[in-house]
């Protein structure tokens, strides 16, 4: 059976980067084969769908699907990668898989109107894996961003992402219970707090 059919038959849940079995199956196959996630999958001659796959590669893909189904872990935890607005982020079980409409608002400039020439310090409260802090620093090169989280584990993941994107001089990470350790003042506060329980 195809990977998508196997995921559907197992009633796998989606929503951590993909919305359906087909998209998640494509992501897992491309990732396991080391192919770009934006690879053409259609009938075009240059499509990776026409590329031969060795038995060893097939076995690796099958093992990944088996792990996804058996553990029920989001694919992002298996691949250690999640994407927001076309930007890749490292993720593991120390932080929630990032998903936020705020990322889209940062990317499309919707928040820009709230900034002024006097905007210098932005706080990303409940930063988790640091994705919104990184995206804010990318969107606003003249701004210093602080990512705060109560979890030292989440901050360790955020540190990986800040370094990965070369923003260690502009994104500072602080362990803080809400605003206790980051009293400000802040010109703008972003916040996408965890809203799922441990079972989700």
Task: Set out the residue ranges of the language-model regions.
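N-terminal auxiliary segments of SAM/dcSAM-dependent transferases
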Residues: 1-84
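Alpha-helix termini
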Residues: 10-15, 109-117, 166
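Conserved long hydrophobic alpha-helices within structured protein cores
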Residues: 1-4, 31, 90-103, 122, ...
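SAM-dependent Rossmann-like transferase core, predominantly class I methyltransferases
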Residues: 51, 59-141, 148-157, 175
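S-adenosylmethionine
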Residues: 139, 143-144, 148-200
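Generic detector of contiguous secondary-structure segments
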Residues: 8, 12, 83-89, 171-179
